[in-house]
Amino acid sequence: MAYPELDAADFLQQLARRKEFKSLISPPVDQKELIRDLRAHFVQIGGPGCEKGGRAFFPCDPYASPFPSIKGLQLHNAQLFVQNFQNPNTPYSRLLLNWQTGTGKSIAAIAIARQFMNHYMNFIENAPWIFVVGFTRAIIQTEMLRRPELGFVSYKEVAELHRLLHIAKQSGSTTSVESRHLNGFVSTLKRRLTDRNRGGFFQFYGYKEFASKLFNITSKGEEKNFDVLSLFHRSDEAEDTLNENDISQFVQKISEAETNGLIRVNQKIMEQLRGGLLIADEIHNVYNIQERNNYGIALQYVLDAFPPHQAPRAVFMSATPVTGSVMEYVDLLNLLVPRHELPNGQPLQRQQLFDSSGHSVKWKKDALALVERLSTGRVSFLLDTNTNFYPERIFAGKMLSYKDEKLPYLHFIECPMSEYQLETLKQLGPDPKISSNAYSIYDMVFPNPKFSKQTEPKAYGLFNSTETPTALSMASTDWLLENGVQIIEPSRRAPFNVSGSFLSLQPPMHISGLAFYSGKYTQMMKDILSIIRQGRGKILIYHNRVRMSGVLILQEILQSNGILNEVSSPVGTTRCSICAAIRDDHTHSDHQFIPVRFTILHSEIEPAVRERSLALFNASSNLEGHQLRILIGSKVIVEGLNFQAVRYEMIMSLPLDIPRLIQVFGRVVRKNSHMELPPSERNVTIYLYVSTTPDGGPELAKYAQKLKEYILIQEGDKALRKHAIDGFTNQIKIDKPMLESLPLSPSITPANVGATVLNTFEAYGYGEQEVKTISNIIISLFMARPVWTYSELWKAVSTPKLIQGITIDNKLFSEDNFALALISLCYSKNQCKELWIQNRLCTIMHVPAKPEHLYVAAVLNHKKEPVLDIETYIRDFQPPMMHSIRITKYLEHSQTKEPFQVLYEKFQKDFQDEPMEQVLIHYPASFHYTMLEALIIDNLAGMGALVEVYKKFFIAFSKKDIQPFPDIFKIISHVPGDDNTLVGYATEDSVRLITSREDKTWHEIPLYMLNINVKRKENDIVIGYMESKGKALKFKIRPPIQVLKKNEITDIRMLNRGAVCETRGREEQQKIANQLGISLNLTKISAIKLCLLIRNNLLQKEMEARNQPNGMQDGIRWFYLFNDKMPSLVHTS
């Protein structure tokens, strides 16, 4: 066979010599030397000193990266390696991607799957399927649908997806027309992945769903309470060992159970997997001892049930493949190594690898050598700490000892328990064993109704999750008031929680505050306020639990100390996101008051709501945290979620084990997660809080025990990784023990790889891939420099790391492939490869010249003919501007079918002499939004009066309007124009700021960041608004919301929609007019004219209210305009 077998003595050596792998050894390059190369080739496009670099082709940005780059997704070397290793041309059946969090495991798996999909497309019939199984399957689907480079969607479809996402977000409703269009479009794309008639080859399952669909318990099995797990019998539950006869005969036992009518194996799934590909993400979840399930049994069955040549290939992924217990290595190896390649052709048993006595476990002699041998050729290991891409990880606090033994790796924020906590802990005895329902004792205790005053001698608190809710719920109202406790109304998703001043750092004089009940949470709050005062930066707070002392109480602690949730309006005690001062004391003149806000993610929140909150927290507009400063997350965030630009991570409780703690670290330390921040801020400070007592305490004891267990796991990790397939390319050398790994050196180094072997490179199409890579590099070089000789271009192409994102060894490129790439890009009468270079549509032309031929990026004219002109690159060239009408959510408020151009012409005709304010009530929202974007992007002439109206009503904003908000002004400061230039406009739920007129790109911020309160108090008389009726806009009125809430309105139709003014009784119209101060002789005025007077009066009052000091925050509401969100009205009678 072309590729070496895994049992070959020199397997890794043979693999490393093949060009498709050897070329992925990233050559070391000195940064100063690389800059010299950039300047020597005249391709430095940015960075300090680029203006003096000797190049004069295109404008140079001294603040940008100096390197040319290739647009779009580029697989990094580790991803390319596993794509080349695990594909239909190689004989390797199973692979574990043991990559640290945030390094692109999902993209690697998709790249592997794409190779198999291309292979299966050649099958005439019975093509196998690709199964993606795991809790994060939705994330993998999302990656497939947002990355056109992966080959599942086109660039045009991705652009349409972004467009639909934007307008659906603006609609503010999951049931709007725009949201339905988005869902339909996404469903169409997803069906392409899974529908064989549309070219789909994928099946997506969660672990539980896969296991339940594979093993169907029959009615007979249900009657006998049959459990598949019973076939995987535990002979000793305490030690969790397996009966070797049972496990070795598991497939046979399934067959017997099927024969006996207890179970039905899904043969359709089995046939789909025959010869297919199985991708299993976060594989440690399928055999975790602490969370017993049948997920691993299902995977083991489908891998073992087929003859070896028909079994599906498998890719497993995990940053921490063993978590709960070191004995999980047995389960991992049984999945990773085909049955016939295990010792004696039988599954591994735990007694083969471990000696155990009671709760003590240790590796047997030679067990680690067996792990090394079995994992050779089956593991890819990646630990990437390149600070060019990853934020620096900084631990706050100090290392601690427990019982005179120093705890390794971790630094802690030591939080001594309060006296009240210590008294409570005494109730558990001298050597307390903390049960699962008593975990709150690690964090805090609750006031105890048994004591009238918590400060009385011998008083102790509550902490048991069974007893605490009952005791507090039955407490008297007087006791609750005396102790500052409020019971939160129970709901289906939050059965019990409390709030109140007892959670405050500064409670009323007679109430014991947070410091009395929790040393840990008091320290957390002090650190949060200190961080806010220090400057910008988002904060992630993690707790493994939801109830009792988990994320729900953390939410209440933040709110009790002046930090708002996503939607609450600021009050006097709300803290500022810039200086942490409360609003009543905010006297800073150098910045506006911006409330500090948090959001929360846990399993009991609807997935759609979690996704929205995460998107807002991660948004580029929230880079500094002034929209959402803090995110509180439970264990739901441990896997599959990525957080962008988080500067501080506060860990309030230990997850189940140290490997999962590493997963929590990895949520915020991810590749490119901090690239939008300045270099000096690309770091994450981690606060690991632990409650302590004078003798250490139960929480510190828990960390000590888990760290001891983790050392054993690390020994297994080292053996697993010792002969990693890509050790010689990833070049991971660890000299001293660290949290992620014990000392480790690759068994093969780049220096001893040996001579390059080309047979498989040429046989399996890697030469074609090299031509494509070279083509992309050539294009990037022409974008930096428009004229090259052949020899100059070849030298630049073969210079390593000259192009950002290309880290393969360019020196191994074939010049023949370079020539092929160049020819394929050059213009001819039969071919014109179009390239966009500096906003010019160009093509590469071959120009015969002496002493050497030239290659020139020539501009194409309107006939797509190349133009070689000496002035091409100094002439200011602007492509024709294309104007489009944006159909947005606002069409749901306006059913008019008239296009913008018709309305625009009507507007120019009607408003030559009319008061310009009337335009706000004569045209639908779609007209206004298209007009606003035209005013901002195209700077329409002769529209000064309309601009002033938009500005008077705080609908449009100029640069001058944004200047009082320094952090927001940074977003638009680079946009050309003076202080009066329009740069943004307000929608129902955000302000859209232009960032590039040329690209028509926008940046959205919440309304409150410009001190716009969407919930201003309504006046006590009447509320006016406009509503679409066909092509007409009708003026409607309704009572103010505070009147509606008093149930004075009994007509439900009136309650929900208001009524057209002209349809109201004459008496009611006159009453409203009199209350508004309209002093004409109303008896002689028609109903139509009277309603016009009321409408204009309300509009005038609305403008005056908005223009009062702080009017957009506290002004009285009179009229809802096209961009105002109407409150939801609910009939309560």
Curated annotation (Swiss-Prot):
GO CC entries: virion component
Helicase C-terminal domain residues: 524-724
EC numbers on record: 3.6.4.13
Protein's recorded name: Early transcription factor large subunit homolog
Residues at which ATP binds: 99-106
Keyword field: ATP-binding, Helicase, Hydrolase, Late protein, Nucleotide-binding, Transcription, Transcription regulation, Virion
Biological role stated in the UniProt entry: Putative initation factor.
